[in-house]
């Protein structure tokens, strides 16, 4: 029934003219019809990725302009690059960012998407031409006038973009001027040094160190500056770092020198190595996150062979990889170093890593032993300072004992009448009695009695040797007798049974074994006696006996 109903519905459209329907459709409806037909039956000649209709074609919902956003991103990236290379001032950057944000907001709110696309395409061409002219002429006023004339005929978004381009040009000129002031060429002498001071004094990082003042303090050997911290000062030049290392050669106060993330290179590392050979006061050095290669690191390691004070060295996270050869050379150079305790570097190879840990543990153990020795010496020194007082007290303390001793001891009675005549108030005279106590120490002489006991041991050894020689003679005689008996009873079965019951020593003697180098053992034993009794007896003569404890 369903098929009949479906055919009836189709029969309604048999009389309809398709050409008239297509002629009555509008352009939008025709486009929609084409899309539907493409979805139903796509073109087989197209690749699979292009047969599906585009699902990203949507009408813009706001006043967004892609070209304006791309131009803004390009300007920001240029600003960041200029800041990294030249070290632009913080104030100028903040003002320019505020101006660019205001201009960007106006452009986004006042420009339509379609109009802005056409306008910005024209603006891009104009900006390129203007920048080329500005680079050649370097005249700000003429460029601004040309921008105003070119933008007068265009719409407001064009004016907005021209304003932004002019601000960008101003920023570029300002940065070029700063570049000419701050760059250090190395050919200007004192003027270039002053310019380098200006460039390094102004830095956007969070390090509050003033480079000029710090360098002056290091050169003047200021007793208050025990640490020089130049971390994260990115716009400091390598020449300034070399000057710091040269100033530290004669400094005797600074204990810590750190210049992490300062773009230091091998030249700075070589200067630091020369400083470490001379300076014997710096205990901590930090050169992490720089551009130092294996050449500079090895130069510092060679300098440590002449330095016996540095205890901490950090050079991890360099721009260039050290490599396996450099790591092995580092370990070789630090084998003889006995002061380095902390090393801030992660070795990639397991061999150098393990050997370096053993070196550091060895150095820590040596320093611990030194501390223990110093403590002991201090304790002994304190005891030595106290000993004279104790001796005086000991001399004074026995004076209290003689007061009671003369009343009872016979020694003091004859001495009192002799010394009582010159002065009665001289009880210290009995001080000699303390020597009598030393006689008790003579009991230690008993240890010499030990050598008296050794004398009889020699006699015992001689007796033992005589006994062994007699036993050997007996054994040799027995061996000869047993050999004769064995020859007589070779063919008898009874002899084989008896041989099976013989001991190992008897078998070896019969077979003519070589004499052993070991000391001779007693010939007869309980086992041998038992075996002889068994051989000489018969079954009738045997009787039951208890097994001795030695054989249980």
Swiss-Prot record:
InterPro entries membership: LRR_dom_sf, TMOD, WH2_dom
Biased composition (Acidic residues): 93-108, 115-147
Example of a GO cellular component annotation carried by this entry: actin filament
Basic residues composition bias: residue spans: 478-488
Chain coiled-coil ranges: 13-46, 86-151
UniProt-annotated stretches for the region Interaction with actin 1: 1-169
Keyword terms of this UniProt record: Actin-binding, Coiled coil, Cytoplasm, Cytoskeleton
Residues in WH2 domain copies: 526-545
GO molecular function per UniProt: actin binding; tropomyosin binding
Family: Belongs to the tropomodulin family.
Subunit record text: Can bind at least three actin monomers and thereby provides a nucleus for actin filament formation. Interacts (via N-terminus) with tropomyosin alpha (TPM1) (via N-terminus). May also interact with TPM2 (via N-terminus).
Protein name per the record: Leiomodin-2
Organism expressing this protein natively: Gallus gallus (Chicken)
Gene for this chain: LMOD2
């Amino acid at each position: 029934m369903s098929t009949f109903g479906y055919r009836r519905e189709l029969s309604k459209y048999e009389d309809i003219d398709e050409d008239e329907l297509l002629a009555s459709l509008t352009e939008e409806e025709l486009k929609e019809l084409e899309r539907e037909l493409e979805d139903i039956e796509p073109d087989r000649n197209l690749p699979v990725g292009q047969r599906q209709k585009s699902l990203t074609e949507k009408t813009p919902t706001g006043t967004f302009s892609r070209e304006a956003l791309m131009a803004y991103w390009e300007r920001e990236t240029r600003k960041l690059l200029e800041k990294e290379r030249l070290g632009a001032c913080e104030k100028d950057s903040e003002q320019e960012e505020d101006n660019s944000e205001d201009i960007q907001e106006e452009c986004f709110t006042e420009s339509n998407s379609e109009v802005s696309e056409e306008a910005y395409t024209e603006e891009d061409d104009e900006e390129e031409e203007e920048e080329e002219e500005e680079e050649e002429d370097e005249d700000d006023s003429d460029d601004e006038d040309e921008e105003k004339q070119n933008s007068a005929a265009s719409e407001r978004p064009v004016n907005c973009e021209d304003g932004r381009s002019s601000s960008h040009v101003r920023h570029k000129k300002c940065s070029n001027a700063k570049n000419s002031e701050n760059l250090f060429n190395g050919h200007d002498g004192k003027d270039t040094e002053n310019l380098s001071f200006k460039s390094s004094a102004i830095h956007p990082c969070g390090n509050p160190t003033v480079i000029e003042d710090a360098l002056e303090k290091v050169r003047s050997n200021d007793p208050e500056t025990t640490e020089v911290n130049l971390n994260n000062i990115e716009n400091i030049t390598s020449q300034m770092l070399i000057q710091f290392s040269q100033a530290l050669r004669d400094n005797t106060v600074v204990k810590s020198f750190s210049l992490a993330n300062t773009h230091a290179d091998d030249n700075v590392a070589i200067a630091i190595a020369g400083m470490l050979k001379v300076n014997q006061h710096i205990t901590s050095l930090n050169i992490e996150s720089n551009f130092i290669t294996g050449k500079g690191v090895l130069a510092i390691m060679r300098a440590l062979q002449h330095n016996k004070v540095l205890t901490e060295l950090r050079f991890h996270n360099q721009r260039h990889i050290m490599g396996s050869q450099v790591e092995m050379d580092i370990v070789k150079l630090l084998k003889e170093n006995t002061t380095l305790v902390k090393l801030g570097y992660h070795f990639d190879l397991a061999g150098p890593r393990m050997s370096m840990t053993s070196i550091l543990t060895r150095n820590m153990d040596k320093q611990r032993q030194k501390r223990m020795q110093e403590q002991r010496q201090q304790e002994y020194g304190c005891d030595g300072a106290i000993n004279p007082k104790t001796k005086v007290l000991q001399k004074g303390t026995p004076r209290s004992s003689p007061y009671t001793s003369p009343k009872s001891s016979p020694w003091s009675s004859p001495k009192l009448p002799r010394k009582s005549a010159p002065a009665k108030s001289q009880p210290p005279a009995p001080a000699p009695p303390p020597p009598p106590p030393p006689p008790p120490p003579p009991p230690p002489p008993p240890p010499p009695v030990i050598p008296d006991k050794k004398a009889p041991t020699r006699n015992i050894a001689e007796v033992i040797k005589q006994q062994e020689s007699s036993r050997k003679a007996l054994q040799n005689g027995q061996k000869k007798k047993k050999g004769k008996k064995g020859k007589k009873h070779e063919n008898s079965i009874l002899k084989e049974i008896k041989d099976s019951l013989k001991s190992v020593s008897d078998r070896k003697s019969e077979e003519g074994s070589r004499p052993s180098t070991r000391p001779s053992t007693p010939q007869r034993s309980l086992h041998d006696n038992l075996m002889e009794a068994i051989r000489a007896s018969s079954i009738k003569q045997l009787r039951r006996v208890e097994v001795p404890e030695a054989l249980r």
